[in-house]
């Protein structure tokens, strides 16, 4: 899932996050980072990676049963668990672990629906945990959060498409290669692949914009944080487009993007306010 790269663009623990939330956010991040490293880093076999992830799953179960877990990153979630916040459920952590297990054994996806299913477990649970921290559990807010988080995950894929391909992972659905009449071979080195990346980016942008209504359920610094998170994703898409959708070029956010990010964040808030209640 490339957690570090994900938060490089979309830092959920930034200074805009209310101070009372930061320890919980940091604990969630450390857990996700550790599990992501288990799935992706080092030279362990897929079976060994899955065995370690299964052990983390047992620790999560112990944590939510009031027992002391063994893994430090799971133990670090104790304060969050003990806060008894509505919406902080064991299932969300198991969903994350199921996505990491999939990372350990799967490098390609046949369909977009399969990719979205992966996003629903690799990204959406984090958004739902963040909403639980601010006491937002409205069903519509959760749906909007899922759209934003899945869009951010997709944007991260298209930002890193060239790097992932060099590691044997191609997140562009194979059905889309067929639909565009191009081969997965040599992806993304062929110019014919640029139209394919454009299609993926357009789809991710539409999904992101479908979730801006979340902002109407939030307030204060956290609303601003999420508005800038949305803006970060949209800005990466703009940079991919500026590179003519050449996935061999990895765009990043820089300090000089702040004015554009501010504009995009403001635009997201205005778009959200125009939505029917």
Question: Residue spans of the language-model regions?
Answer:
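Catalytic cores of Mg2+-dependent Asp-rich isoprenoid enzymes
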Residues: 1-152, 158-277
């Amino acid at each position: 899932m490339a957690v570090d790269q994900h938060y490089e663009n979309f830092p959920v623990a930034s200074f805009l996050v209310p101070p009372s939330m930061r320890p919980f956010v940091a604990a969630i991040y450390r857990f996700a980072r550790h599990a992501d490293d288990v799935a992706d880093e080092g030279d362990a076999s897929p079976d060994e990676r899955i065995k370690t992830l299964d052990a983390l799953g047992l620790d999560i179960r112990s944590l939510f049963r009031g027992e002391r877990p063994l893994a430090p990153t799971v133990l670090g979630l104790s304060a969050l668990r003990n806060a008894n916040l509505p919406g902080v459920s064991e299932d969300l952590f198991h969903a994350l672990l199921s996505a990491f297990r999939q990372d350990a054994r799967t490098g390609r996806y046949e369909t977009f629906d399969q990719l979205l299913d992966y996003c629903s477990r690799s990204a959406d649970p984090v958004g739902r945990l963040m909403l639980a921290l601010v006491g937002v559990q409205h069903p519509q807010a959760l749906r909007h959060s899922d759209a934003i988080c899945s869009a951010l995950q997709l944007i991260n894929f298209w930002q890193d498409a060239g790097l992932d391909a060099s590691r044997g992972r191609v997140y562009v659905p194979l059905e889309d290669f067929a639909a565009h009449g191009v081969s997965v071979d040599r992806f993304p080195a062929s110019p014919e692949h640029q139209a394919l990346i454009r299609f993926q980016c357009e789809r991710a942008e539409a999904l992101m914009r479908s979730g801006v209504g979340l902002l109407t359920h939030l307030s204060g610094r956290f609303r601003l944080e999420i508005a800038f998170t949305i803006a970060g994703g949209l800005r990466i898409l703009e940079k991919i487009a500026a590179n003519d959708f050449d996935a061999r070029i990895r765009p990043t956010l820089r300090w000089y993007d702040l004015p554009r990010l501010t504009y995009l964040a403001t635009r997201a808030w205005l778009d959200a306010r125009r939505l029917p209640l």
